[in-house]
Curated annotation (Swiss-Prot):
Pfam families: KRAB (PF01352), zf-C2H2 (PF00096). GO terms for molecular function: DNA-binding transcription factor activity, RNA polymerase II-specific; RNA polymerase II cis-regulatory region sequence-specific DNA binding; zinc ion binding. InterPro entries: KRAB, KRAB_dom_sf, Znf_C2H2_sf, Znf_C2H2_type. It comes from Homo sapiens. Its main location: nucleus. The keyword DNA-binding applies. One of its GO terms (cellular component) is nucleus. Signal peptide: none annotated. The keyword Transcription regulation applies. One of its GO terms (biological process) is regulation of transcription by RNA polymerase II. PROSITE patterns: KRAB, ZINC_FINGER_C2H2_1, ZINC_FINGER_C2H2_2. This is Zinc finger protein 790. The lineage of its organism: Eukaryota, Metazoa, Chordata, Craniata, Vertebrata. Belongs to the krueppel C2H2-type zinc-finger protein family. May be involved in transcriptional regulation.
Length: 636
């Protein structure tokens, strides 16, 4: 009597739990194989009950639901018609060569003894040929078993072996479990091995994600007959081509009823629905974190194992996820597929484009609960919140100064390194910060809009103008708590306080000498490097400090010397024009022989040299001696 074929006789039995463990690619592959099995059964003359079950499978219905509906059994009328129908071999069915892959798919879950046309084919030589082909196929699978791709997929292959009859040719030594086909034997071995590689000697490619191994296995075993007319890409399965076409058309037929989000594949929608239900059935044994999808758990576990299977061929950098490798490779290729439609700016990642577009839309979705200030990026909000809590997480390793923003620390560190990346295009002068360069450029534009009513002096910036007015008012708002000294500017007070603390945070790496201020360290370092950035345009002579260049320029300009209004003394430089203090301030040092007084000990010592004839600096060309090295330098 002929047996009636049902969906469960062709399909691999997946429970609901097992089906949910599969990722999208594995589910699509399952549907393709089952539909191919159905096509082969029909072409060989089988009597199939409920063909609409395969139609439901093609539309995306889960196989465990189809099997559940099928348990109601066939109607008696259908069964009787199938029993009485004379099944004859189709003309020329064995005249063509039956591919091994088709035989494997037909015979994977069935031996020839359980086929419904068994009685009708008794004694037929063609039927015997099919049996021989099946056995030869099994042998071929056994011979090629070691070359086939292996991968670890417990949830896919830990299935019920529902075989009615047939010899079990392959026995697995570890458990003593038997299998009817070499492919089942190979699949079962995957449970006991953690190796994940493609065994094709010609390609030598390696993979770890299960879905890629399955897809890659299909590439090596199945001829690609379905070609996309848009881009020329070919596929071995019609459903793969159908899904691929949606990339070009943008079609997303599967829509979520809760949020309206659409997807290209039904399996993607099924995974998405778990977001709304909150279902997370896959839990990490290491940390207890749960996931809604098994593939997410697999990727997460690589954090604990440190496994990074995806390696960049350019720089050999490894990644735990393939998507991370793809994004990284864009650094080498320069590819920026995400382009802003507003300004044309391109980005390597979609998230970067999303953030950039907020500049055009003005959207600031991250709001501070303390003050209501909104930000475009969450990272900016996180840093802003440090203002309210007083937290300064960014600390300078050189001097210990801390900042709220990482950008402020980066700018501060230029003081220690001496780096001045901002250069004036007009005069070539460099600056540590962009704001300093912007202020400097106003000098060339000669925009001095702030004028002092007291003395008529003009200033570029309002802050400079305000500080200048304190000279006339005598206002000194900044007082030192240690000694009570007052200052015009807060920066002057900060520098002064270092005298009391004795802290010299700016240390020269060459000689170990420490300084109170970064500018002192910068000037000092030029002694080691020999750098002389200040060049005279008249004669080309260069100097370490700007003040030296200023003094030198007076040689070319014939500038009038500095003269004292109270006496007839004349000085070559303003820095030595201190005789005014003799007339206006207390005299600290007195020369006993001549009764002269001086406001500074250094001037007093220099004055003594006049009478003791200690002149140690001699200019050979003029044979002129000087009582001070500074006067000797000033003449140069």
């Amino acid at each position: 009597m002929a047996h009636l074929m049902m969906f469960r006789d062709v399909a691999v039995d997946f429970s609901q739990e097992e089906w949910e463990c599969l990722d999208l690619e594995q589910r699509d592959l399952y549907r393709d194989v089952m539909l191919e099995n159905y096509s082969n059964m029909v072409s060989l003359g089988f009597c199939i009950y409920q063909p609409e079950a395969f139609s439901l499978l093609e539309k995306g219905k889960e196989p465990w639901k189809i099997l559940r509906d099928e348990t109601r059994g066939p109607c008696p009328d259908m069964q009787s018609r199938c029993q009485t129908k004379k099944l004859l071999p189709k003309n020329g069915i064995f005249e063509r060569e039956i591919a091994q892959l088709e035989i494997m798919r037909i015979c994977k879950n069935h031996s020839l003894d359980c086929l419904c046309f068994r009685g009708d084919w008794e004694g037929n030589t063609q039927f015997q040929t099919l049996q021989d082909n099946q056995e030869e196929c099994f042998k071929q699978v056994i011979r090629t078993c070691e070359k086939r791709p292996t991968f670890n997929q417990h949830t896919v292959f830990n299935l019920h072996q529902r075989l009615n009859t047939g010899d079990k040719l392959n026995e697995f030594k570890e458990l003593g479990k038997a299998f009817i086909s070499g492919s089942d034997h190979t699949q079962h071995q995957l449970i006991h091995t953690s190796e994940k590689f493609c065994g094709d000697k010609e390609c030598g490619n390696t993979f770890l994600p299960d879905s890629e191994v399955i897809q890659y296995q299909t590439v090596h075993t199945v001829k690609k007959t379905y070609e996309c007319k848009e881009c020329g890409k070919s596929f071995s399965l019609r459903s793969s081509l159908t899904g691929h076409k949606r990339i070009h058309t943008g079609e997303k037929p599967f829509k979520c009823k809760d949020c309206g989000k659409a997807f290209r594949f039904h399996s993607q929608l099924s995974v998405h629905k778990r977001i709304h239900t909150g279902e997370k059935s896959y839990e990490c044994k290491e940390c207890g974190k749960a996931f809604s999808c098994g593939s997410d758990l697999t990727r997460h576990q690589r954090i604990h194992t440190g496994e990074k299977p995806y390696e960049c061929n350019e720089c050999r950098k490894a990644f735990s996820q393939r998507s991370h490798l793809i994004k990284h490779q864009r650094i080498h290729t320069g590819e920026k597929p995400y382009e802003c439609k507003e300004c044309g700016k391109a980005f390597t990642r979609g998230s970067h484009l999303t953030q950039h577009q907020r500049i055009h839309t003005g959207e600031k979705s991250h709001e501070c609960k303390e003050c209501g200030k909104a930000f475009i990026r969450g990272s900016n909000l996180a840093q802003h919140q440090n203002v309210h809590v007083g937290r300064k997480p960014y600390k300078c390793e050189k001097c210990g100064k801390a900042y709220i923003w990482s950008s402020h620390l980066a700018r501060h560190q230029r003081i220690h390194t001496g780096r001045k990346p901002y250069e004036c295009k007009q005069c070539g002068k460099t600056f540590t910060w962009a704001s300093y360069l912007a202020q400097h450029e106003k000098i060339h534009n000669e925009r001095k809009s702030y004028e002092c009513k007291e003395c008529g002096k003009t200033f570029l910036h309002g802050s400079e103008f305000n500080r200048h007015q304190k000279i006339h008012t005598g206002e000194r708002n900044y007082e030192c708590k240690e000694c009570g000294k007052t200052f015009f500017r807060g920066s002057e007070l900060n520098r002064h306080q270092k005298i009391h603390t004795g802290k010299r945070p700016y240390e020269c790496e060459e000689c170990g000498k420490a300084f109170l201020w970064g500018s002192q360290l910068t000037r000092h370092q030029r002694m080691h490097t020999g750098e002389e950035p200040y060049v005279c345009k008249e004669c080309g002579k260069s100097f370490i400090w700007g003040s030296q260049l200023t003094r030198h320029k007076k040689i070319h300009t014939d500038a009038e010397p500095y003269g004292c209004k109270k006496s007839s003394h004349i000085f070559s430089h303003h820095s030595y024009f201190t005789e005014q203090k003799i007339h206006n301030s207390a005299n600290l040092c007195e020369w006993t022989d001549y009764g002269n007084t001086f406001s500074h000990e250094s001037n007093f010592a220099q004055h003594q040299n006049i009478y003791t004839f200690e002149k140690s600096y001699e200019f050979k060309d003029f044979e002129k001696a000087f009582s001070s090295s500074s006067h000797f330098i000033s003449l140069l």
